[in-house]
Amino acid sequence: MNSMEFPLFDRTTPNSVISTTLNDLSNWSRLSSLWPLLYGTSCCFIEFASLIGSRFDFDRYGLVPRSSPRQADLILTAGTVTMKMAPSLVRLYEQMPEPKYVIAMGACTITGGMFSTDSYSTVRGVDKLIPVDVYLPGCPPKPEAIIDAITKLRKKVSREIYEDRTGSQQENRCFTTNHKFHLGRSTRAVNYDQGLLYQSTSTSEIPSEAFFKYKSSVSSHELVN
């Protein structure tokens, strides 16, 4: 089950001493200790109920689901990711220790699915937020496909080189955001003749100084442009 091909791991001396490299030993030790963080937002996540059952029993791969990102090294994303959920997903990914991996499960996670059609609130692909190692298409994917994706990820882990992994982690730092808490104040609004309608301009186009406008107490009659 856990046997992987290591180029330097099979060489033995006449005294039955295994000679290998630190890189291969590190990869071998992580093969059976992938602890996933299950991030499900839609119907694809229901397939995990079958995967955890006795028929498929994904515990045999050493997968122990964790509820804390600081104890996980694999995150399984399943379901639609909305704009409101995007910062939470990025924060969970950043809280995971290195090395860490991502499996995108389902069409909604990979491309946004049918919910991304003419939708302003759906992220069209989780890879726009965090780097993805394995894509698992389907609506929803079967438990056998999930096991196959985990097997492919384990093969990738077994062939990793420490220098390449470190360089890849530095390149992916572009996904890091500075989490700083700001004092939330009244949001801006536009006063139309027909009534008060909230402005739909994306927050990325509004400077942070203009986005939060200080008012000690604001009533509905005091909202101006």
Curated annotation (Swiss-Prot):
Its cofactor is [4Fe-4S] cluster. Keywords: 4Fe-4S, Chloroplast, Iron, Iron-sulfur, Membrane, Metal-binding, NAD, NADP, Plastid, Plastoquinone, Quinone, Thylakoid, Translocase, Transport. GO terms for molecular function: 4 iron, 4 sulfur cluster binding; iron ion binding; NADH dehydrogenase (ubiquinone) activity; quinone binding. GO terms for biological process: aerobic respiration; electron transport coupled proton transport; photosynthesis, light reaction. Coiled coil: none annotated. Its EC number is 7.1.1.-. It is an enzyme of class 7 (translocase). It is found in: Plastid, Chloroplast thylakoid membrane. Binds 1 [4Fe-4S] cluster. It is a peripheral membrane protein. [4Fe-4S] cluster binds at residues 43-44, 108, 139. GO terms for cellular component: chloroplast thylakoid membrane; respiratory chain complex I. InterPro entries: NADH_UbQ_OxRdtase-like_20kDa, NADH_UQ_OxRdtase_20Kd_su. NDH is composed of at least 16 different subunits, 5 of which are encoded in the nucleus. It catalyses: a plastoquinone + NADH + (n+1) H(+)(in) = a plastoquinol + NAD(+) + n H(+)(out); a plastoquinone + NADPH + (n+1) H(+)(in) = a plastoquinol + NADP(+) + n H(+)(out). Its main location: plastid. Belongs to the complex I 20 kDa subunit family. It comes from Nymphaea alba (White water-lily). NDH shuttles electrons from NAD(P)H:plastoquinone, via FMN and iron-sulfur (Fe-S) centers, to quinones in the photosynthetic chain and possibly in a chloroplast respiratory chain. The immediate electron acceptor for the enzyme in this species is believed to be plastoquinone. Couples the redox reaction to proton translocation, and thus conserves the redox energy in a proton gradient. This is NAD(P)H-quinone oxidoreductase subunit K, chloroplastic.
